[in-house]
């Protein structure tokens, strides 16, 4: 696995990574030398993680806090919903909402499903501020994301290639766009 913090086109700063599982190598020592290009892999996963700072930058919310809506412990578990707290543009004070996280035809959709703590008269501003869409094909995932989730206070978008061959671009997390045409 290779992981790096990087400036991601669109979202801003986040962590990008590539993981490979169940490699079939002619010589197992190749793994120690990092010579895996051309090997069969059960799974190659590209992942982008955005914390409250990175995702808040996208939303224009400088004080964004993200948590699992059902388990607010630091580990938080995995969820397809998130509890977000922050001051959306145009609001006077922070609000707390639960949002759904969905992928439809390669586009990430975030929609408020529950208003938990919102100042009177700011409901529509908060609903608008926590509504967001992002075309994941523009991210360094090598194609559209096939999973979105909240894990431990960060959003994760990922794309899996199953039963594939490791390519040179798989060794660099930010090279994902170069594999777009080959795997769609």
List the predicted regions and their residue ranges.
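Solvent-exposed coil/turn segments that connect beta secondary-structure elements
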Residues: 4, 21-23, 87-89, 102-106, ...
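Extracytoplasmic/luminal low-complexity segments enriched in Pro/Gly and acidic/polar residues
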Residues: 118-184
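Short beta-strands and strand-coil junctions in structured, solvent-facing domains, enriched
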Residues: 6-8, 91-93, 157, 165
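A short, surface-exposed beta-strand/turn
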Residues: 16-26, 99-104, 173-184
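Amphipathic hydrophobic-ligand
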Residues: 10-17, 92-96, 140-142
């Amino acid at each position: 696995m290779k992981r790096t913090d990087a400036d991601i086109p669109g979202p801003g700063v986040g962590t990008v990574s590539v993981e490979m599982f169940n490699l079939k190598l002619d010589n197992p020592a190749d793994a120690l030398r990092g010579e895996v290009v051309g090997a069969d892999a059960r799974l190659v996963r590209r992942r982008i993680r955005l914390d409250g700072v990175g995702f808040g930058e996208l939303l224009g919310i400088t004080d964004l806090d993200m948590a699992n809506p059902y388990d607010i412990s630091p580990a938080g578990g995995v969820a397809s919903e998130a509890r977000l707290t922050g001051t959306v543009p145009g609001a006077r004070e922070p609000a707390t909402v639960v949002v759904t996280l969905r992928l439809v035809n390669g586009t990430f959709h975030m929609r408020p499903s529950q208003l938990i703590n919102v100042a009177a008269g700011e409901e529509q501003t908060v609903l608008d501020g926590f509504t967001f869409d992002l075309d994941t094909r523009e991210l360094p995932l090598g194609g559209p994301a096939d999973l979105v989730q909240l894990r431990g206070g960060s959003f994760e978008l990922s794309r899996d290639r199953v039963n594939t061959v490791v390519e040179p671009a798989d060794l660099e997390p930010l090279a994902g766009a170069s594999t777009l045409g080959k795997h769609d």
